[in-house]
Amino acid sequence: MWNRREIMGAGAAAFAASSFTRTAFAQGEQEQVEIDLRQDIGALDHIWSRCAGSDRASATLREAWRNDLERFRNETGLERVRFHGIFNDDLGVWPGGMNGKDPNFQNVDAVYDGVLERGVQPFVELSFMPKKLASGNTKLSFTYNANITPPASPEAWGQFIAGFVRHLIDRYGANEVRQWYFEVWNEPNLTWFFSGTQADYFAMYKAAAQAIKGVDQKLRVGGPSTAAAQWMPEFLGFCAQENLPVDFVSTHIYAGDDQMELFGQANRYPHKDVIPAAMAQVRKQIDATRYRGAELWLSEWSSDSPAMIAHVISNCLPYCHAMSQWCISNVFEEINFPNFILKEGDGGWGMLAQRNIPRPSFNTYKLLHRLGQRRLAATGPALASRTKEGAAALVWNLAEVKQPSGVPGMASQRIVNGQRKNVQVRLKGARPGATVRVSYVDQERGSPLPKWRELGSPQYPRKGEIDQIRRSAELASPETRRLDRQGVLTLDLPPEGVALIELKA
């Protein structure tokens, strides 16, 4: 099993490798789901729509990326977007040399203006290090070569952060910026992203947190934004000792992360349960400190499997305030410049393929968005809700998706092991014979791949072909079905498939 460190070290090679999908499944296995329309068990917090990830800040200036963001907002209810590198030298924030004594926030404004104009707020990742403040010249091995060294002076870093925050308040107003989140750095426990030590990061966090609160006590700051849920006890202990604010705790988990590192035991959980188990562990670590009850943000995770997305979100509901899937768009150039719009096997990180083409992961979020705000009791693979019109429930057929890295975007092959299932959904409290609407997403329905293959799998589809592919990948109109006399609906779901059942009262 690869882990995040190995992924980063072998990223370019993994991207260059050929990819394919192989699916193995048997026919006809049954799954039982029961939903009680009469039993409201509390609020259903839409933790999945609070944030999603993206590439670097400068990529957000592109029309194609902004079109993807706008679509995400309009069709999935996305509230915030997180991206790297708001301080990167490619935005000219503070390169040093002949560029003046003060920071330049012109391009920062263009980035945030573009996000806010589309009805989305930024989740502000404070990264990476402006050249003027850097203690060295170590660069991130991405296409944009950001400086990943600690600040030469934590005090100067703090003054810079204070000036940055004051500028944001001057431009957007305190009431707006108080709704944002300020996350200090990205994965500082990986040498790929930070050349300093844990102590260097803690000093950097202290300076940033004190600077932000020095401008406005109502602004929200948190961290440590580590990979694989590392440094939690140490970070929270340091902050408690130094009496520092931690308004939220953030970390990243991928299903393929090293379980020995995560849990102290290799292969303790199947892929599907790694993320929920890690979130339960982090929640327990937080609540053992003075920061008990602090919001837990899973500010990076990912899956390209519809059923896996539904399963992970459903099982993280008790622990997380927000889950930010990486990432919204295949306008994405961290390791290299993609030479494809679609491809077999691993299709990249983006839930929207290039040219605004929806993928099954995006369409899964569209279905999640149609769930209501009250949760209904359910057993089996289901997330059920009460809506203004009646009820909506997402059901799924979970399969094991095996990729070397455990995440989309870095895998040379994609192997799916699962069974096609007849999912029998009993709706307790529904009128026998009632009409329901059913919408499906899997690797064939709500997917661009069937039409792309039909067109000959072109590497560079023509404009007319792109339009055909995009139309083919849209969610189909709901299928109208009737419950049987026992209030049961039987669905035929392939491995990875999800279905949204909607019932009018």
Task: List the predicted regions and their residue ranges.
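Short, flexible/disordered intra-domain loops and linkers
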Residues: 97-98, 194, 261-269, 336-341, ...
